Amino acid sequence: MIKPEARLHILYDISKELISSFPLDNLLKAAMNALVEHLRLRDGGIVIHGSGGEPWINVRAPIGDDVRSRSLTIEQADAINRVIASGEKHFGKNSVVLPVKVNRKAIGALWIDFAQKSGAQDESLLAMIAVLIGLTCQRDRELCSDGGSVAEEQQAGQIPKIKPKPHPTQLDKIDWIVGESPALKRVLATTKIVAATNSAVLLRGESGTGKECFARAIHALSIRKSKAFIKLNCAALSETVLESELFGHEKGAFTGALLQRAGRFELANGGTLLLDEIGDVSPQFQAKLLRVLQEGEFERLGGTKTLKVDVRVICATNKNLEVAVLRGEFRADLYYRINVVPIILPPLRQRDGDISLLAQVFLEQFNNANDRNCDFGPSAIDILSKCAFPGNVRELDNCVQRTATLASSNTITSSDFACQQDQCSSALLRKADGDGIGNDAMNGLNSRDTMSGGLCAHAGTPSGAAATIEAAGLTERDRLIKAMERAGWVQAKAARILGKTPRQVGYALRRHRIDVKKE
């Protein structure tokens, strides 16, 4: 029986392996290794059939001295073949065989023989892993021009080529996402696959990586594209206001509620709702949110009539939800509800070659908005390409606009950039967090405390005091008290020091049971 807290680590490790850029067989081997590391297995493996129906990938659990010398028993082979043929899962005494599906068709199987009795929760976890494997296989096939697989072409000695489909449609075009890097193309391929379903999506990545842009892309590529796309930043509102915004309210529900008002769920009925910064929702509100996500029904604030809606919910966060679950700050059931298909957005520093493309787009937007005719000199793009951009695409946009505004001529040169004049505001972030700034934020997982990671995880720009507090090596509680003392116990001022919102600071004060002093 797998412990509840271990399931989160297993799911994270498997997801991390499957989103890598290695060949499919290597990804599946890495996933199998992760399963062996976390589970007590007697045997196990992943079998994937090629586009012609023949077995072409057979990954075996690395148990024992020589994996290659082991062959499947008649019972194992029979169970695997039946699952692939029927698309239905199979259970043995201490074993389970789950179908791996692409476009609802079983193209392989994940089979596990447990060394001890398993439970329903173990089988549920493995079912989620089988779905992730299926999405990985589908992405691999999407990258091949003839509907086969990149891995199949590589095995045949061919060089896989990414070509447009014979009859491209408007659905293949996402104008507002710019880039040609392999990291971005992988995410776009997954986005197009996920958009064709109604599955819940969790967009994860550092601040400024474009989570809202990808949410819009999922909506635009889905069958819901003709309906509304509604967004809400959960971190920007207090719990009471957040409830009213999401669920709406009746006339007279509270002071100032002069009219009945529809909430975001009602407005998004039939369409898509983006809940940004979902990791900042309080535990009390999480229970209310879980109900509408599970049942699709709710009541307006102050009302008694139950309303039903059909909404696809996309959540986004730059927080480490797994750690939040383990700390009891985020409900595990809500985590599983929103994390059906996680999409991890790469930071700008991992998108080779995209900085120059994005910079040209942002400069063109600046020219159109200000009736200017600026362009980049030869050395300007080199300067931009060497920057780490901890604020990612958002910071690059700001950098281009600021430089174009203050440039001495219409041709932007290297000397026009703030970083060449020792005036780069993001230098404080890099100094506070080191050169490897935000390396884990792409996965929403920081090894450090949430408050310490807040310098890079939030859009707010921290003050110089934040770097001092950060560098002091204090605990999260002590850092919070230190910031409040410097701010004269004014939450709004402390929030600016820490680079967080007042609501986040208020929640942290309650969580650490810190009484606010009157000065």
UniProtKB/Swiss-Prot annotation:
Region of interest: Inter-domain linker: 406-476
Matching InterPro entries: AAA+_ATPase, GAF-like_dom_sf, HTH_Fis, Nif-specific_regulatory_prot, P-loop_NTPase, Sigma_54_int, Sigma_54_int_dom_ATP-bd_1, Sigma_54_int_dom_ATP-bd_2
Organism annotation: Rhizobium leguminosarum
PANTHER family xref list: PTS-DEPENDENT DIHYDROXYACETONE KINASE OPERON REGULATORY PROTEIN-RELATED, TRANSCRIPTIONAL REGULATORY PROTEIN
Name of the protein in question: Nif-specific regulatory protein
Binding-site residues for ATP, renumbered to this chain: 205-212, 268-277
GO BP terms, alphabetized: nitrogen fixation; phosphorelay signal transduction system
Function: Required for activation of most nif operons, which are directly involved in nitrogen fixation.
Known DNA-binding region: 491-510
Residues at which a divalent metal cation binds: C419, C424
Alphabetical list of CDD domains matching this protein: AAA
Residue ranges, annotated region (C-terminal DNA-binding domain): 477-519
Entry keywords, A to Z: Activator, ATP-binding, DNA-binding, Metal-binding, Nitrogen fixation, Nucleotide-binding, Plasmid, Transcription, Transcription regulation, Two-component regulatory system
SUPFAM superfamilies: GAF domain-like, P-loop containing nucleoside triphosphate hydrolases
GO MF annotation, one: ATP hydrolysis activity
Quaternary context: Interacts with sigma-54.
NCBIfam families cross-referenced by the UniProt entry: nifA
